[in-house]
Design a protein with these regions (language model features):
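Residue-level micro-sites within transmembrane alpha helices that shape
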Residues: 54-58, 127, 169
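Short, basic/glycine-rich phosphate-binding loops at helix/coil junctions
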Residues: 154-160
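Active-site-adjacent, His/Asp/Glu-enriched structural segments that form or flank metal-binding
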Residues: 61-145
Length: 171
């Protein structure tokens, strides 16, 4: 494992494993710990015919692995007072757990199993399709979400428009 020095606060240690996996560790005396996997891909990385896939995968990873059914996944951390969750945004997809430090091994093993061995059962794909459709409809019925999207489009589209002349300038 190679230890890196980057622009992180000194309280953080950052490592890169031989397989390229990056680890950021913050030592703490707290009795509560957090562990997660972040994938540097979110909705912004989807092609037009892939829209919604990052969010869909985020839901499906909880539906089964090669050695666990969905209820095993959900109960694994809850049984020891921990929490398991995930989110997707425009920049990343994240799965994480909060737990008492004594259960780090349990949390890390579960997250690793989910990230590397999810099975995406067909019956769960069909069920989750309905859940995602409901979430999209709820999102589209929320004016504050739509206003934020419009605002973001105005900002970023104006930045693209402003920078276009310099990108295409002939020298």
């Amino acid at each position: 494992m190679k230890k890196l020095k980057e622009n992180l606060p000194s309280a953080f240690n950052r490592y890169i494993l031989p397989n390229g996996l990056r680890i950021i560790h913050e030592p703490s005396a707290s009795k509560v710990a957090y562990c997660g996997f972040a994938v540097d891909a979110g909705t912004r990385d989807e092609l037009e015919n892939e829209q919604g896939m990052a969010h869909f995968v985020e839901h499906l990873i909880f539906k089964g692995t090669a050695k666990r059914k969905a209820w095993h996944i959900l109960n694994r951390m809850e049984n020891v007072g921990g929490d398991l969750n995930a989110y997707t945004n425009k920049e990343e997809t994240m799965i994480y757990s909060a737990f008492l430090t004594e259960h780090f091994g349990r949390a890390f093993e579960l997250l690793t199993d989910i990230v590397f061995h999810s099975t995406f059962p067909q019956r769960e794909i069909e069920k989750e399709t309905e859940v995602i459709i409901d979430e999209i409809q709820s999102y589209e019925d929320n004016p504050s979400e739509l206003i934020f999207d419009d605002f973001e489009d105005l900002i970023f589209l104006s930045l693209i428009h402003i920078s276009e002349p310099t990108r295409h300038a002939q020298i």
